[in-house]
Structure formats: C-alpha cells, structure tokens
Amino acid sequence: MKSIKGLGKLLLASSILFSSSAFAKTIIKLGHYNSDIHPSHIALQEYFKKTIENETNHKYEIRLYPNNQLGGEDQIVNGLRNGTIEAGITGLLLQNVDPIFGVWEWPYLFKDNQEAKKVLESPIANKIGQKMEKYGIKLLAYGMNGFRVISSNKKLEKFDDFKGLRLRVPLNSLFVDWAKAMNINPQSMPLSEVFTALEQKVIDGQENPYMLIKDSGLYEVQKYIIQSNHIFSPGLLQISLKTWNKIPKEDQIIFEKAAKLYQEKEWELAIKTELEVKDYLAKHGNEIIVPSEAFKNDMVNASKVLYDSFYKKYDWAKDVVQKINEAK
C-alpha cells in the first residue's frame, strides 16, 4: 500500500514538473544602443516583440534593453557570436572580422533613404547578410539609422570650405580616410567626448545622423548642419545563431514574419522622425544647408580615390558595388 502511495506521489510530482516546464517561457534578451524613444526601439516594442509573443501564445518573452544596458556594440556582437546574448541591434561592427559587412557605409553609395531601403531589401543585401552565419550570427532585418550629416560652427557652402575643418569622426579608418579625401582634418574620439570638445572649441564640428545630433544634444553647441548625406548607416537586427538553432522551424517562421514587419515599420518611423528632427533643429537655431549640385558633385568625385583603394584591396569589391548599383 505504501509503495502504491509512494508511486502516486512520484507521478503527481512528475506531472507538476512536466506541466510547469511545458509552459515555461523562453526568454530572448535583445540589447541595442538607441534610446527608448528611437524609431528602432518603438518598432521592436510594437511590432517585433508583440508579433512573436502573441503568435506563439507567449511561448517566448522578448525583453528589450535600450541605451546599451547589455553593453556597447562590441559586447553585443561578441555576445551574439558566443550565445550569451540572444538578440541585438548593432551597426556594422562585424566588418572588423570581414570587411564585406562594412560595404553599406561606403561613401556616397546611396542618394536617399528610398534607394538605400530598396537595395537593402535586394538579393545582394540578402547574400551579404547570410555570410554573417559563418560568424555565429543570423541577420533578421536591416533597419535605418540614417544618413550622416556634418554639423559645424563654420558655414560650409562649397567644397573648398572643408579645408582645415577640424571634424570629429568615429574611431574607424573608413571615416578617417573619407575626411582626408574631403581635405578635412579628422579628429578621432569617442562620442562621449564630442559635446565638451565642441563646447571648448577643440574641434569645429562632427558628423552623425540627424537623430543622434538631437538626442545627444550636439545641436546646442553647433550653428550649421550641412546635409552632406556622405555615408548611410543601417542598424542590423540580429539573433545569435546558437539561439536561432534552438528555435523550432514553425517558430522561426513567426520570428521571420515579425522581423519583416519590424523592418517595414522601422523605416516608416525613422523617415518620419528624421523630418521631425530636422524641423526641431531648425527651430532651435541650427541653419540647415542643402549642398548645391556642384558641391555634391565635388564630394562624390573626391571620394573616387576611396573606391580605387577598395577595388585594389578587396577582390570582391567591384562586383559587389556593381550588384548594389543594379539593385537601385
């Protein structure tokens, strides 16, 4: 009798254990560098997260960590590669292990947001994205950080005005080489130091997308914004391949659907927000200068030396750029 009772207790305990594990949620931590009011975070919250949670009957919980709460870009990329962080949005940091991932930020590659979006939805973008799996990352979507523009305390209306301009650029050789091609004096420093450097007139200007200029308060210590649109920066929504391979196929389909919806809505929000930010900056004392055709042509022509260098350095470069141009 005792053995029967003991067996009954064991079966009951087993059923409770099975039942609780059957309904256990899988936690997906997703970290990124943008604020919680940035279009990318809003699109994650409203479309990516909700679609996955609702359509899997809350089998997954997507936890969002904006403002570098899970670490900076390099920590996110490393976490994705080794599986300690499930998902994230970063820029093109993976170009440090394979330069092809940096191609989207080559100067003057795109003329506007619509052209960039069209190319980033094309087969060549897909093909490049798939190469990330070799490094332990699955690309889910290309988002929009936006075109980089120049803010300055000097009025820049023609190419010759660039000469000697002390411009902060990221700690990245591509940006340094671009600046030198423009006859600009590049000053590499972390973003956290830029506001003070501008305030103390250590530098004359900096370059970043409109949204970052507003969110970081840089517009407060700058007078002019030159809409140079010299480099387009995407934001990549990614998931660790280790995490991805644990997700059943039927759920992977839902993740991909959510990522596609995220991509569409994030671009819509980002383009709308960029226009609002430009209006905000103009109302807060920044003069926005749209370069003349001659000025734009001078910038594009000056960048050709960079492409000559790319073509000599990378045997894939000419073919990839050709495919990008064909996708426009």
UniProtKB/Swiss-Prot annotation:
Family membership noted in the UniProt record: Belongs to the bacterial solute-binding protein 7 family.
Location of the protein in the cell: Periplasm
Keywords: Periplasm, Signal, Transport
InterPro entries the UniProt entry points to: DctP_fam (IPR018389), TRAP_DctP (IPR004682), TRAP_DctP_sf (IPR038404)
Pfam families per the UniProt record, alphabetical: DctP (PF03480)
GO annotation (BP), single: transmembrane transport
GO cellular component, one term: outer membrane-bounded periplasmic space
Signal peptide span: 1-24
Source species of the chain: Haemophilus influenzae (strain ATCC 51907 / DSM 11121 / KW20 / Rd)
UniProt name for this protein: Uncharacterized protein HI_0052
Protein origin, superkingdom: Bacteria
The keyword Transport appears for this protein: yes
